[in-house]
A protein has these predicted regions:
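Preference for long, solvent-exposed alpha-helical segments and helix-linker "stalks"
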Residues: 23-218
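Bacterial Sec-dependent N-terminal signal peptides
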Residues: 1-26, 76
Length: 218
């Protein structure tokens, strides 16, 4: 009987802890979201970044990973514009970039599905584009991420990834990481994706996307 009472008491403690944690998540989320809106209005100026925003965001990221997808969208902005862009210390910048990569990977882990199905390919593509932008020396990681995006989504791949992927394929060849034949192979594959999307968007009269696709192909 005493054992049963002890187990029951322990269960209530756990339930209480879960409720407290959920409340903490809500509080931190509301707090950092308010600060990030203000920061957005300041055009992500690092000097206008409130330290409490980072503290509250970090608490959500570490302790409430499946609470809101916005945690990861906002995390990319915080790391890229608040830290990576302004840091002169290369060793420290690498750590910030590692965190940026982790944010993308965690988003894919906890929020793999979007409105139209799997969004993992799109998340990996965005990771690859950011790696090219902020850490061009990490081109192999960028290649892996962008290739995953193209492989997973095929004709439905974000057309914004096409240029970045082909560019990093060329970089891989120049550095002896891929055979020269990869350039022609991937050009053919990407051209098929572009042609498919031009056809689809011509039928739906989406001129803006058509112009971008034609630019990518040129």
């Amino acid at each position: 009987m005493k054992i049963r009472k002890s187990l029951l008491a322990f269960a209530f403690v756990l339930l209480g802890f879960g409720a407290t944690q959920a409340q903490d998540c809500e509080t931190d989320y509301s707090l950092y979201r308010e600060y990030i809106k203000q920061w957005e209005q300041a055009k992500y100026n690092p000097s206008n970044m409130n330290p409490q925003m980072v503290v509250s965001w970090r608490n959500i990221f570490l302790n409430c990973p499946d609470f809101r997808q916005n945690t990861y969208l906002d995390g990319v902005k915080i790391m890229a514009y608040g830290f990576i862009r302004t840091t002169k210390d290369e060793a420290l910048k690498e750590k910030y970039i590692d965190t940026l990569v982790m944010i993308y990977d965690k988003r894919a882990e906890y929020f793999p599905m979007g409105k139209n199905g799997s969004q993992v390919g799109n998340i990996m593509g965005r990771k690859g584009v950011d790696l090219i932008k902020w850490a061009p020396n990490r081109y192999e990681e960028a290649y892996t991420a962008l290739k995953q995006a193209i492989d997973m989504d095929g004709n439905n791949a974000n057309y914004g990834f096409i240029d970045s992927y082909f560019s990093v394929v060329i970089t891989m060849v120049k550095n002896g990481k891929l055979e020269e034949s990869a350039i022609l192979d991937e050009y053919d594959r990407l051209s098929e994706i572009v042609d498919y999307n031009i056809k689809v968007n011509t039928e739906t009269a989406n001129e803006k996307i058509i112009r971008q696709l034609q630019y990518n192909k040129s």
